[in-house]
Amino acid sequence: MGDVVVNTEGGNRLELSYYTENGVNVVRVCDWYTKLGESGIHFSSLGNNMSTFKSELRNLQTKYEQWIATAKSNKVQEVEKEMPCKISYTTYDCDAYAGNATKVIVQPYFVIRNYVPRCEIRIWQYFYDRTPNYNVWYLSPKDIPFLISAIDKGYQEYIAKSTQKRKTEDLFK
């Protein structure tokens, strides 16, 4: 598994992990943050099939750009609207109390406050024996293409490391 950490303009620190499962390339994107007394807490995890997830991000970006243009042309100062876009998720909770969620809701929102647009991906994770987790990823207009680019770049690094590891292992058979 390869890991890449990216910091978004919207203020999130995301960790991208790559692996192959049953012949399918998988990416998992975890929000990474620090709490008092604890560092490197993974809160929630999006992604799955890498090509599907990137396609969902592109669709989200397209809708986001359309709504930004509409808001600017109409001088919208404040709005909060659910975006009609699907985002994949994994039920794996990446934090210190790791486990599988029994229910996950992932919903992107288009939000403008004082004429400043952003996309919020809101994530609710429900577990058998715990208080539900709630997390928000704040993404600026530049963050979604940046995230897609980081996924591609990180995956290429993952492939290069996997290939090198395989070559090294073959030397010592």
What are these regions (language model features)?
Residues 1-173:
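Positively charged, low-complexity terminal tracts
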